[in-house]
Amino acid sequence: MSFRLALAAAVVAGAAAIVPAALGDALYHSEHLALTPVGDAPLRSGFVENIHANGPNVYAHEVYVLNGALPNTTYGVTLLLHPNDPTCSGAALAVPTATLTTGVSGNGRADAVFDVGTVDAFGIRHATHGIVWTISGGGSTYTTTCTAVTLD
């Protein structure tokens, strides 16, 4: 019985040692942002998932999803970056990130992955910025609200 207890304690201790490595960014955690249609653009649901792994190969991973949008349409995803302006009240830098194509039901998904070098090239680390995502195509546009993103 004591062998089983010792083995169980070792497994729990090993798992606890692994968990901190999976926590990702200490300043900005993953965020799920709803997309809303601009005007009368069709949309059942949609979102942007902004994930900050903060690693050397994957600094950030964004997932874009449309459900019930225009069918068979190609959309461009653009990140509107408001440098050092977490309220998105000033001028934005438009950063195209991905292309998303919907199927016959108007559903589509795309991803963008940013490494540290890409983020450093923009000179935006160690600050808080406002970001709005837009997805546009076929005369329809979908947008998120402004969110403050702190990059370390």
Language-model features: where?
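Bacterial N-terminal signal peptides that target proteins for export
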Residues: M1-A8
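C-terminal segment of classical bacterial N-terminal signal peptides
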Residues: A15-A22
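N-terminal leader/targeting pre-sequences
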Residues: L23-D152
